[in-house]
Design a protein with these regions (language model features):
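Active-site-facing substrate-recognition patch
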Residues: 1-37, 44-65, 72-113, 123, ...
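Basic, glycine-rich
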Residues: 120
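PRPP-dependent phosphoribosyltransferase catalytic core
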Residues: 115, 125-152
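Generic enzyme active-site microenvironment
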Residues: 40, 116-117
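Structural alpha-beta junctions
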Residues: 68-69, 140
């Protein structure tokens, strides 16, 4: 995953394929049966321009092709460009994600089941920042999916 994001030649197709593989593992389980949208953790436009792709969005696309669940990239937006989290300490991660995201048109997620998707969960601070913005939406159920987790 790290090489796909930060290597000399970042490669979006790796994340798409990993998303398909992950979805194929869960296709017979019922965990995605009532999901309305797969929502990738968004990148700031500057980081998106630098990398050329959003790895979480590529994972979502792969999952969507297998599970037939739409990908929503319009409602959850990153409004601040924070430093890379991968090598930060826990408290710094929590501080880095404050007011990092906004929900546009939250009423459209009312009574929906949303699954947030990212490549790796380390401290959970990014996912928690997104969920904090989503919890006021009436009837919105939130799930979380990541390809992996990092630990020390």
């Amino acid at each position: 995953i790290e090489q796909g994001k930060f290597g000399a030649h970042p490669y979006s197709d790796v994340f798409y394929r990993l998303g398909r593989l992950a979805a194929q593992e869960y296709i017979d389980a019922d965990i995605f049966d009532d999901v309305d949208y797969l929502v990738p953790i968004p990148l700031h436009p500057r980081r998106m321009h630098e990398r050329g792709f959003n790895q979480a969005e590529e994972i979502c696309k792969g999952m969507s092709d297998v599970l037939h669940i739409p990908v929503d990239t319009q409602h959850l937006v990153r409004v601040r460009n924070n430093p890379h989290q991968s090598r930060s300490e826990f408290q710094r991660r929590k501080d880095n994600v404050k007011d990092l995201f906004e929900i546009r048109y939250p009423e459209e997620w009312k009574n929906k089941h949303i699954v947030l998707v990212d490549d790796v969960i380390t401290s959970g601070a990014t996912m928690m920042a997104c969920m904090r913005k989503m919890t006021p939406i009436r009837g919105c159920r939130i799930g979380v999916f990541a390809l992996g987790w990092a630990h020390k």
